[in-house]
Amino acid sequence: MESNLAGDSIPGPKWRKVAYGGMQIGYDDNYTDESFLEEMVMNANVVRRDLLKVMKDSVSISQYLCIVALVVLVWVHTLESSLDENSLLLLDLSLLASGFLILLLTEEKMLSLSLLLRYLVNISFFTTGLYILAPIYQTLTRSISSDSIWAVTVSLLLLHLFLHDYSGSTIRAPGALKTPNLTSCISVNASIVASVFVASRLPSRLHVFAVMLFSLQVFLFAPLVTYCIKKFNFGLHLLFSFALMGLTLYSIYALHRLFFLVFLSLVLLVNVVCPYWLIRMQEYKFEINGPWDEAKLCFDITD
């Protein structure tokens, strides 16, 4: 009887999966058993994207690229004296009227008569101040060479495009209060400074006023208008974007065929190549989760 008890082995303590508590008797420090990976989850938070949806979302980027390209085309034609002051002022009035019309049609619940009147008063003050400051803008960079002006202008436009909010997350609804983030502020300021540099190379005060008014209308007002169109009807947003692409490509082709090929390649890269590349990269995305992950807060600490 005693010999049988002596022959039986006494089982050791069972291994426990604990993060703290020191070494467990009978097991190495790096020991794991079969139950260690039972709670592992693979690709739990990976979002599987559809190619067509990604291509539709990328249209917003091409749309704004076309808007900036059209602004540059207006600058070029103005510097070459192809557009006079009266044509520019007529273009400014047309853009302002069409922008307000789109806002009235897409945001009729947000826009009231008092808010519209307040906008008109602010625009009148803004336009008056811009006209008064036009002579200062005209002579602001007289002592700087034109090559330096064009180099800085191109750099500022690239910075504007790089930091621009293409998702529309920083755009506020009409009448709403929303603090913009740092990158969107830098993007807008870069576009304004680029407009001032271009306007400083124009021959007359009225030219400067018309170009500055056009540029500021587009850079400050166009993102809100395009965002309202997209929120109102996505199909209308696609139709407007493709029409804008066609107009831009036609205008660039009439100006220079090499620039047309470059811009067409850029549009295809943004709308076709990059979405396809993103979908292909999803195949190699691998994420594992388990009890070893750091704890995450499930509430907003700002509340």
Curated annotation (Swiss-Prot):
GO terms for cellular component: glycosylphosphatidylinositol-N-acetylglucosaminyltransferase (GPI-GnT) complex; membrane. Pathway: Glycolipid biosynthesis; glycosylphosphatidylinositol-anchor biosynthesis. It is an enzyme of class 2 (transferase). Keywords: Endoplasmic reticulum, Glycosyltransferase, GPI-anchor biosynthesis, Membrane, Transferase, Transmembrane, Transmembrane helix. Disruption phenotype: Defective in pollen germination and pollen tube growth. The chain crosses the membrane at residues 59-79, 87-107, 120-140, 143-163, 179-199, 209-229, 234-254, 259-279. It comes from the Eukaryota. InterPro entries: Plno_GlcNAc_GPI2. GO terms for molecular function: phosphatidylinositol N-acetylglucosaminyltransferase activity. It catalyses: a 1,2-diacyl-sn-glycero-3-phospho-(1D-myo-inositol) + UDP-N-acetyl-alpha-D-glucosamine = a 6-(N-acetyl-alpha-D-glucosaminyl)-1-(1,2-diacyl-sn-glycero-3-phospho)-1D-myo-inositol + UDP + H(+). Pfam families: GPI2. Expressed in roots, stems, leaves, flowers and pollen grains. The keyword Transferase applies. It is a multi-pass membrane protein. Part of the complex catalyzing the transfer of N-acetylglucosamine from UDP-N-acetylglucosamine to phosphatidylinositol, the first step of GPI biosynthesis. Required for pollen germination and pollen tube growth. This is Phosphatidylinositol N-acetylglucosaminyltransferase subunit C. The lineage of its organism: Eukaryota, Viridiplantae, Streptophyta, Embryophyta, Tracheophyta.
